[in-house]
Structure formats: C-alpha cells, structure tokens
Amino acid sequence: MARRRKGRPINGVILLDKPTGISSNDALQKVKRIYFAEKAGHTGALDPLATGMLPICLGEATKFSQFLLDSDKRYRVIAKLGERTNTSDSDGEVVETRPVDVTLEKLEACIEKFRGESDQVPSMFSALKYQGKPLYEYARKGIEVPRESRKITVYEIILHRFEGDEVEMEVHCSKGTYIRTIVDDLGEMLGCGAHVTMLRRTAVAKYPYEKMVTLEQLNELLEQAHREEIAPRELLDPLLMPMDTAVEDLPEVNLIPELADMVQHGQPVQVLGAPEQGFLRLTMGEEHLFIGVGEMNDDGKIAPKRLVVFRDEE
C-alpha cells in the first residue's frame, strides 16, 4: 500500500521577509506549514539576527534552489565601532572594547579595500560544516577548527551613514560572503573593533524587493481564508513566484514536444543553435512551459540535470 503523502504538491518560490530572532530553518518550517507544502527548502541561510529576503522554494522548485544559492546578494548593514564580539554581531558576547578614533577619510579608505575579489575565512559562528557538524557547534564549546578561505567578490560597497560609533553600509556581493566577517575585518583595519547590530538582505538574484511578504501577512491570509470559508490556497498561492524564476538567468532552449519527451525520459538530445556549454533552462512548446534544467555534454547534446515532475493536487 502506497504511503499517503503529507502536504500538497504546490510548486513555486515565496519571497519571505524573514523576521529577526528566528533561524532560517524555523522560518522555513513555518512557511511550509502555512502552505501545507509537501516539500520546502530555503536558498541560503540568514543569521537569526538578520532580516530580509529569504526565498523559500516549495515542491519541485526545491530542485533548482542551488541556482539561487549561487546568486549575488545585497545587504544593508549597521556596524557598531569600538566593540568586538565573539560572533561578530550583537548576539554574541563583547570580548574587546577599544576607543573609537576614526575619521571619515580613514573609514572611506578602509571600506574601499573590500571592493573586488578577495579571500575570506568564514566565521566560526557560521553554518558551514566541519566533519559533519556546523562550525557554530564547535564555537559554542570554545573549539577552534581549521577553515579554508574562500574566494568572494564585493561588487559594490557604499557608505550611507557615519555617526558617532555607528556605520551604515550597503553591500552587493557574491555567494558565500559573510557580512559579519567584513565588519569584523573593517573594525580591525580601523584599529577599534566592530560588530554587526543590524543586517538586512535586500536582494537575492533579480527578485523584486516589493514582492516580499512577512509571516504575519501569510498568517493573516490563512485566518481570512478560515473566516471566509474558502481554501487557503486561493489567497496564498497567488503570492508565489514561478519556479523557473530561480533559473531565469540561464539561456533558454525551447524544445518541440518530441524532444521534450525524450529529455523527460532521461535521454540527451541534439538541438540546433543551442549554446555550446553550460546549464540551460528547458521549456516546451509554444507556451514555453518550464520542464527543467539541462547541461551541454561532451557530445554537444543537451543532457537532463534537474527535471520537473508534474503532479495534480489530489
């Protein structure tokens, strides 16, 4: 006897405005329950302190979350000068206090040094894993473990405000960039120490800021549906972005139904005019129905990599 599935096969991406004080996984589980979704996954964790854009993939969209993990991000951050903490943010304990003797000219010169490509060593208080455990589990026990530096790129870093011991900046960066580490490094450059007091992610890939929704808004829609005695999906589902928005930057290859059927059965196909390499966004027919992601193989054919499984709600 087939096991009954828990949740419904809803597909799409919800742009959650994560509140401060909860983990990204807690936020994910709340959204999953609200949507009664069968599957859900986020696309790059935010610290509990942080707020802002947390794209949550539902259903088949989870197959394409890696492409959002790899995308550029934008942040707004406020740093407090003069205090260094063990987590590089205000959730941690102050481990060092130093006087702040910083001029605007010195601050601008130090900030400019972060622009471009560099090597960054991740914080011990991060979710990266070492021997199967998150680094923060070691850090909480006072254990320091080796971490490899990673190539990151800061495309843009803008100073918006410098008042007293507070610095407010905007950062546009590549995947895997730790803003806490940038702030900690900035504090050391300035000779006074620093830590993050506010962090807000304002953009992931090309998703529009104005499409974000809060947990409160989702819960209000849920309550409204119960009051009006309608299915919650009627109010909740229109908020979802199409799942192919996760891969909208990939070149599109539109397949005729016969070739699409071959791809959906795992067979590589030859398509005239297709790019010579890389991942491809595969669509089918005149409606350009998204069916998944393929990759050019060594034979010059499109091989299926991640395919959408279409299922109706029961």
From Swiss-Prot:
<dbReference type="InterPro" id="IPR032819">
    <property type="entry name" value="TruB_C"/>
</dbReference>
<dbReference type="InterPro" id="IPR036974">
    <property type="entry name" value="PUA_sf"/>
</dbReference>
<dbReference type="InterPro" id="IPR002501">
    <property type="entry name" value="PsdUridine_synth_N"/>
</dbReference>
<dbReference type="GO" id="GO:0160148">
    <property type="term" value="F:tRNA pseudouridine(55) synthase activity"/>
</dbReference>
<keyword id="KW-0819">tRNA processing</keyword>
<dbReference type="GO" id="GO:0031119">
    <property type="term" value="P:tRNA pseudouridine synthesis"/>
</dbReference>
<dbReference type="GO" id="GO:1990481">
    <property type="term" value="P:mRNA pseudouridine synthesis"/>
</dbReference>
<dbReference type="InterPro" id="IPR014780">
    <property type="entry name" value="tRNA_psdUridine_synth_TruB"/>
</dbReference>
<keyword id="KW-0413">Isomerase</keyword>
<dbReference type="GO" id="GO:0003723">
    <property type="term" value="F:RNA binding"/>
</dbReference>
<dbReference type="InterPro" id="IPR015240">
    <property type="entry name" value="tRNA_sdUridine_synth_fam1_C"/>
</dbReference>
<comment type="similarity">
    <text>Belongs to the pseudouridine synthase TruB family. Type 1 subfamily.</text>
</comment>
<dbReference type="InterPro" id="IPR020103">
    <property type="entry name" value="PsdUridine_synth_cat_dom_sf"/>
</dbReference>
<protein>
    <recommendedName>
        <fullName>tRNA pseudouridine synthase B</fullName>
        <ecNumber>5.4.99.25</ecNumber>
    </recommendedName>
</protein>
<dbReference type="Pfam" id="PF09157">
    <property type="entry name" value="TruB-C_2"/>
</dbReference>
<dbReference type="Pfam" id="PF01509">
    <property type="entry name" value="TruB_N"/>
</dbReference>
<dbReference type="InterPro" id="IPR015947">
    <property type="entry name" value="PUA-like_sf"/>
</dbReference>
<comment type="function">
    <text>Responsible for synthesis of pseudouridine from uracil-55 in the psi GC loop of transfer RNAs.</text>
</comment>
<dbReference type="Pfam" id="PF16198">
    <property type="entry name" value="TruB_C_2"/>
</dbReference>
<feature type="active site" description="Nucleophile">
    <location>
        <position position="47"/>
    </location>
</feature>
